[in-house]
Every structure is written in structure tokens, then in C-alpha cells.
Amino acid sequence: MVNWKIGVLIGALATAAFTLLPFSNAGLIAATPQQSYASNVQLHAKRSSVDFVPDGDSSKLAWKQAKWAEFDNDASGNSHFPEILTRVASVWTETQIYFFFWCRYDSLNVYQGEDPKAERWQLWDRDVVEVFLNPLPERMNHYYEFEVAPNNQWIDLEIDKAKEPFNDASWNSGFAHATRIDAKNHIWTAEMRIPISSMNVSAIHPGAEWRTNFFRAAGNGGDDRRKFLAWSIIPEGKTFHVPARFGLLRLVK
């Protein structure tokens, strides 16, 4: 896979290269900045009365009461893959925001024999779920990326598309995460807890509206053989990094 996080192509190569890249988080070229949001999909994140430690178990009361979204379409919205149907939910407290992914799978493609405690560069080249999160939507091109793999490997990045390279792997959110694999039923789950202070947010209040998109990469081989799903579709691009297509995350009571 082309390693988009090393840098950004320059000058005249940029436009041409953008059209040739596979549809994945690993798109090398940032999309042209847009001034308004073009997606009307939304998810309600309900308030949790307590904070909790992620363990990958959806039986918690918070997740039973949560609003769930599901998607099986590729990032362009043109194809559907029910065999890797993905569900996602979010809840929040005054200091944390949580996400839970429930994922069908055929087979798993992960890095073998590595320490899941260490941040894993190029995690997007294996099976992964991803949250792109913008708590300050008026700042469209500055947001945060969180990835977790079935074996609980992870990476987090600060994205600023005004910079080259636009991704900062040195940023560390301190987010907690856990996964479970149900091999019998071919389901894997991932649970994330993100401190809002890591994103320069001092508090969450009911009624807040953030912008987000959820992604999943699955399958073996090169990008031409893998599947790349998106909650809010991106019909105009070849990269996940099109913040104008982020959906709406409503933080409600």
C-alpha cells in the first residue's frame, strides 16, 4: 500500500495522483478543502451517567441504551458488503467520549506477533475500524483520527490539512481501547474511550454538535482486493480525508 502518512505529493503531481489512488484511509493526497458540510447523516450520542473502562463488551447498560447506526456500503456508496456489516454507537460524559464498533467478518487480517500496547504505524494496511472526529466543526480541516484493529493494535493522529504532511503521529490522545473476537459467530468488536481534553475541549454539554465519520477496512491483499466502508459516503474522492463529508454527531441527554 502507498504510505500516505509520509508526506504529500507536490505541485502538478497532486491532482493526477489523487485520481489514481485506491479508495482507502491510505489516500496520499488530501482532498481540496471545502467550505461547508455536504453530509446529512447523523448519529445521536447519548449521555452516560458513569465513566467506564473499555473491554469490548456491548452488554453494558450504556450500549444497550445507545442509538446505533449501521453501514455496509463502500466509501463511494456504490457497492454493499453485508458480509462485513458494521454497527457503531457513541455515548459521552463530561470528560470522555466513547465509541463502540460491532463488525461481521469472513476472515481477519492483522499484524501477527506484535505488542498491541505500542502504537502501530500503517495499521490501516490491515483490518481496522476508524473514527475521524472533529469537536470544533467550524475548523473543518483540523480533526483527529483513531484506529483500532481486531487484535487491539492502535494508532491516533492529529490531522491538519493546512500542513504538509497533514498527519501528526507524535500526537497522543491517551485514548483507551479494547477488542473482542467471537470466532464462532464471526463477529469482532472494538470499544474506545477518548479524553476530550486531548482535543482541546474543556467540557461537553447536551446539544453540542460535532462532525465525524466512521470507516472500516477489511480483507487481505492490496487495496484493489480489500473493502473500505464508510458511514457517510464520499462520492467525489479517493481518500477518507474529505471532512466536508463528515456526518453529524449530536451529543444529547
Name each region found by the language model:
Residues 1-13:
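Bacterial N-terminal signal peptides that target proteins for export
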